[in-house]
A protein has these predicted regions:
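Short amphipathic alpha-helical oligomerization segments
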Residues: 165-169, 173
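N-terminal beta1-alpha1-beta2 submodule of the flavodoxin-like/Rossmannoid cofactor-binding fold
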Residues: 1-114, 172-211
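Short, glycine-/small-residue-rich phosphate/pyrophosphate-handling segment
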Residues: 113-164, 180-183
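Ligand-binding pocket scaffold of soluble enzyme catalytic domains
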Residues: 3, 7, 11-18, 126-128, ...
């Protein structure tokens, strides 16, 4: 008897642009490209533009009436891979991305049956765009926070584009995607899917023994 094939891996991309759903967004575009690479590897993908939700300030899993975070958190918990896509503003990630990290911080105290924080075993990717410097710092900040919360970071798990200094061309205005960006995006997606499958088949050991 052959065992049933495991379900496909899944990914959710949180688009942390400051622009609403109807506005073109470079953060949305680079996330789409990353999700496209994940889909080509058999990963089921979804994306959410966070600015269209009411993500209330705070560090609790549910901040009460009017908070859309619990529904979004449920999607993050059900996915194997989290993609954080953010623009660069004044050299930093967007305020929306920072809000997401603050809300995820509550998950440190939510443990599974083996005493592991709920996000342990999930994989995180970062995508950053901007026409100013800052991508490396933003990726470092994102990965420090996400790893602290419990996410695993794959090898070369980020993709980014920064335009020339003192000019106003956005990523979505380019005639074509630079080869270096496309190659980096493909590698990040490939490595994330690989790591997610490894962690699904061989989870991290328990943090605490049975009572």
């Amino acid at each position: 008897m052959t065992s049933a094939a495991p379900p496909p891996l899944s990914a959710i991309a949180l688009i942390c642009t400051l622009k609403g759903r109807d506005a073109p967004s470079s953060s949305d575009l680079i996330a789409d490209q990353l999700l496209g690479q994940l889909r080509s590897g058999g990963v089921e993908c979804e994306k959410v533009r966070c600015v269209d939700l009411s993500l209330l300030p705070g560090v609790e899993a549910d901040m009460g009436e009017g908070d859309d975070w619990p529904a979004l958190l449920a999607k993050i918990k059900s996915a194997n891979i989290l993609v954080m896509s953010t623009p660069t503003w004044v050299g930093h990630m967007s305020s929306v991305a920072q809000r997401v990290l603050e809300r995820l911080d509550a998950e440190l105290s939510d443990q599974d049956h083996a005493g592991r924080p709920r996000m342990v075993g999930k994989v995180a990717l970062a995508a950053v765009v901007g026409n100013e410097d800052g991508a490396h710092k933003i990726v470092a900040d994102l990965f420090q926070a996400l790893n602290d919360i419990g996410f695993s970071i794959p090898a070369q798990g980020c993709t980014y584009w920064n335009g020339e200094a003192m000019q106003g061309v956005d990523y979505l205005e380019l005639d074509q995607t630079p080869e270096a960006v496309a190659t980096t995006t493909a590698a990040a997606a490939r490595n994330a899917a690989h790591l997610a499958e490894v962690l699904r088949q061989s989870p991290y050991p328990p943090y605490a023994g049975p009572d």
